[in-house]
Every structure is written in C-alpha cells, then in structure tokens.
C-alpha cells in the first residue's frame, strides 16, 4: 500500500472519532512495505501535528467543507498539504502520489478535487498562510479552545508550550537501578557509540542525542533500561518508598511507573496495579516480565473499591489519573484532533471521584501522589484544592523536587523543547481516618 494512503486511512479513523492514532496506525503499517513504514509514520504523525494549521488552509482552498462521510478524502488532502509544506518530498511527487491514492477510495470525484486543491496550494499556499499568521490557531497549530486555555492559564509561557508541543520529543531512558547506576549505564552507551547525557531532575534519567531502535541499547532485552519520559520518572522518588510497604498504582497502564516503583524499592511487601481495561494490562505484564518484576494486576474501575480492594490498607498510592494528556501532545499529536473543550470538566469530575474512592484505602500516615500529564490547572491544582476542602483528614506535603513551577497546590511541569513532557504532581498525607 502507498504510505500516503496508509497514513490517510489511519488519520481518517481519528477524524471520524473512531480511534486514536496509536490504535489506528499499526494496522495500516502492516499493509506497507517495511522500507516505507518510517515514511508512513512521519506522514501520519506530522499531519496530526500540524492539522489545525493545515485544516484552516484547506478551508481557504475548498469551496465547501467535507461531509463527515468523506473523512478519508479530507485526511488524504491533509497528508498532501503536509508533504508540500513540511517535508522535502518534491511537490510533483507529493501531488502525483497523493492524487493517485484517490482511486483506492472508490470516490470518483475525489481525484479531480485533490489534484486541483493541491496544485493551488503549491501555487498560493505560502501566501495564504502568511496572510493567516495573525490567527493564533494558524501560528501555533493548536485548536482554538486549547490555544485560548493555554494563553489564559499560562500568559507568559503559552507560546513556548505550543512550540514544545510541536517539536519532536527527545528519547529518554530510565536506568534500572537494580542493575546499574546511571553513570555506569552512560559509560555503556559511550562504549556503544550512542550519544547521551544525564537528565536534570530524574536520578535515573538519560536523554539520548538521537532516537534509536531500543534493540540497539545495551541490555534492553535483559531489563537494564526502559524508555520513559523524565517527568514521569519523578514519581518513584516523590513517593518516598521504603521496605515493607504495600503500594497501589491506580490507572497503571502501560506500566512504566509500576515498574519504576518496583525498581526503586526492591523490598516492597506488595504492589497492586489496577487499570480499567484488561487488554491494557497485557502491556503492563510484558513490561514486568522483561524487567523480571512482579505485581498483582487487576482489571477494574478503581472507583468501585468493593470489587477489588481486600480491605488491607496501602501505605503508598500513586494515582496517575486519566486526563486530557495536553502535556504529551508532542508524543501524541492527534490529541489536537480528538480532545474537546467540554472534555475537561468531565475529566476533572472523574479525577475527583478517583481521589474520593481511593482515599479510604490509604493507611493513616500514608501518602498519595496525584499525577497527570495535563498542563491545565482545571485538572490539577483545582482538583487538589477541591479535594482538600472536602477531606478534613488530608494534608498537602511539599514535593522534594525543583522541577516545574510551584502552584497553589502541587507543582506543574511544562513541556520543554529537548526536555521533559508536561506533567503535574501533588502529594497528600492522611492524618486522620474520618472524612467530613
């Protein structure tokens, strides 16, 4: 299959609201030659990254918008525009190959439309975009609701946040301290000719000069190292783990933090890791097996404690709550296409429900670390503020890290070009069992 068609079909599923790019793309990658998989991936992720900008350009070039049933043609047009403005593919090849894919859509009218619009884009696109630059949606390539939210919440940083969201993310490793120190693993990378340096905040983190195939990393198959962003790595030390503790990782998939907690403290009495979907726990088990670690995995709704909790209290809880994922857009650019403004209040409600449900499972004197990969205070400091107000037995603790910006509650890490993702942490201690 032509990589342009494969990318467009994956993107069409996203545009139709049927899938994320991570779930729709693998099936399409299986249909292209192995040598074209890199191009297919770039076309899909690159188009998603710049979709808000390309969509407004397409609106200028089209006489009328696409119907919902024509998401495949819309996606193919966006892939064509991405090639013209963001790749080194010669214009004649980008247009010819993209238009040629239209035959596979079984929509006879699509070929002529794509040919006309892409050729006009080649002639007039740069001038049209220049005239649209005043629109922050065009300038930042972020949907309007998100651009406005970031500007409102982060008036001094919002443009830098958008720039970081549009940048290619660095590849960051987490060294398994059960096997090597970070310095020792840096030496192994140097011996292998792989450029790398220590992360600023995570004691286990290493940022690679260039992304590489994990199979080329020393000891990857043996569990010496994993791929995980620096911001997500902070949870292991912030939780203040100690031997004999019973730990809960709520909403644990894909298991990176579960594994890191087990690596960080070999003497834990018990690790319970839960997630809503059983199929997502398969990935958690694969990660545990590669690292030769073990945890009790349970598929359940964390809010329904009667269905999974055995009544034995936890000394530590990590709640990496479901969120808008606005801090990891650079890794999942289709978030720009799928997330909507009205998702945020619903997510904040869910986050509060999770805190309320899990709090009774925490031992008096125990700690709960609340985390999200969101950059929106509605899901972060405001959720913690509301929880503290309704929970007399909860107190907030300072976070032992300089990462991020201090907030009224917790700390907010903003995505940085070449650095960590956007993330939020707040740490709570249970000082009394009763709740008002």
UniProtKB/Swiss-Prot annotation:
Q: Residues that bind S-adenosyl-L-methionine, according to the entry?
A: 251-257, 275, 301, 320
Q: Name one GO cellular component term.
A: cytosol
For the biological process aspect of GO, one term held by this record is: rRNA base methylation
Q: Which Pfam families match?
A: Methyltr_RsmB-F, NusB, RsmF-B_ferredox
Give the primary localization class.
Answer: cytoplasm
SUPFAM superfamilies with a match to the protein in the record: NusB-like, S-adenosyl-L-methionine-dependent methyltransferases
Reaction(s) catalysed by this chain's protein: cytidine(967) in 16S rRNA + S-adenosyl-L-methionine = 5-methylcytidine(967) in 16S rRNA + S-adenosyl-L-homocysteine + H(+)
Subcellular location(s) of the protein: Cytoplasm
What's its EC? Answer: 2.1.1.176
What residues form the catalytic site here?
A: 373
Give the InterPro entries listed for this entry.
MeTrfase_RsmB-F_NOP2_cat (IPR049560), MeTrfase_RsmB-F_NOP2_dom (IPR001678), NusB-like_sf (IPR035926), NusB_RsmB_TIM44 (IPR006027), RCMT (IPR023267), rRNA_ssu_MeTfrase_B (IPR004573), RsmB-like_ferredoxin (IPR054728), RsmB/NOL1/NOP2-like_CS (IPR018314)
- What is stated as this protein's family in its record? Belongs to the class I-like SAM-binding methyltransferase superfamily. RsmB/NOP family.
Q: What does this protein do?
A: Specifically methylates the cytosine at position 967 (m5C967) of 16S rRNA.
Q: Which PANTHER family did the record assign? A: NOL1_NOP2_SUN FAMILY PROTEIN _ ANTITERMINATION NUSB DOMAIN-CONTAINING PROTEIN, NOP2 YEAST -RELATED NOL1/NOP2/FMU SUN DOMAIN-CONTAINING
Q: What is this protein called?
A: Ribosomal RNA small subunit methyltransferase B
Q: Which organism is it from?
A: Pseudomonas putida (strain ATCC 47054 / DSM 6125 / CFBP 8728 / NCIMB 11950 / KT2440)
């Amino acid at each position: 299959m032509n990589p342009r068609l494969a990318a467009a079909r994956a993107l069409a599923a996203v545009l139709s609201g049927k899938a994320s790019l991570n779930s729709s793309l693998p099936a399409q990658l299986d249909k292209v030659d192995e040598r074209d998989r890199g191009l297919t991936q770039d076309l899909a992720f690159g188009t998603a990254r710049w979709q808000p900008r390309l969509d407004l350009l397409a609106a200028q070039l089209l006489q009328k918008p696409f119907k919902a049933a024509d998401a495949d043609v819309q996606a193919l047009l966006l892939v064509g525009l991405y090639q013209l403005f963001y790749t080194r593919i010669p214009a004649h090849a980008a247009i010819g190959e993209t238009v040629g894919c239209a035959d596979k859509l079984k929509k006879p009218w699509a070929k002529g439309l794509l040919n006309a619009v892409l050729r006009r884009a080649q002639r007039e696109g740069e001038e049209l975009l220049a005239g649209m630059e005043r629109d922050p949606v065009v300038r930042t390539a972020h949907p309007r609701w998100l651009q406005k939210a970031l500007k409102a919440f982060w008036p001094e940083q919002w443009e830098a946040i958008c720039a970081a969201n549009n940048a290619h993310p660095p590849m960051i490793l987490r060294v398994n301290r059960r096997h090597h120190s970070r310095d020792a693993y840096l030496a192994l990378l140097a011996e292998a000719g792989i450029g790398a340096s220590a992360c600023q905040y995570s004691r286990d983190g290493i940022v690679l000069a260039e992304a590489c195939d994990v199979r080329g990393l020393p000891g990857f198959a043996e569990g010496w190292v994993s791929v995980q962003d620096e911001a997500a790595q902070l949870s292991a030390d912030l939780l203040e783990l100690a031997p004999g503790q019973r730990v809960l990782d709520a909403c644990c998939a894909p298991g990176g933090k579960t594994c890191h907690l087990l690596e960080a403290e070999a003497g834990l009495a018990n690790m319970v890791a839960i997630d809503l979907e059983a199929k997502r726990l398969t990935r958690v088990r694969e990660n545990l097996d590669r690292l030769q670690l073990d945890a009790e995995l349970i598929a359940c709704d964390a809010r329904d404690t009667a269905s999974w909790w055995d009544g034995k209290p936890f000394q530590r809880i990590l709640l990496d709550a479901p969120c808008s994922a606005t801090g990891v857009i650079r890794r999942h650019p289709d978030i720009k296409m799928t997330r909507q403004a009205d998702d945020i209040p619903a997510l904040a409600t869910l986050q509060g429900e999770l805190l309320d449900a899990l709090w009774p499972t925490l031992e008096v004197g125990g700690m709960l670390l609340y985390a999200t990969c969101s950059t929106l205070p509605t899901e972060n400091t405001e959720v913690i503020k509301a929880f503290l107000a309704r929970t007399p037995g909860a107190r907030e603790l300072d976070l032992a890290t300089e990462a991020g910006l201090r907030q009224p509650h917790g700390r907010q890490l903003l995505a940085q070009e070449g650095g960590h993702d956007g993330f939020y942490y707040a740490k709570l201690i249970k000082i009394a069992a009763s709740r008002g």
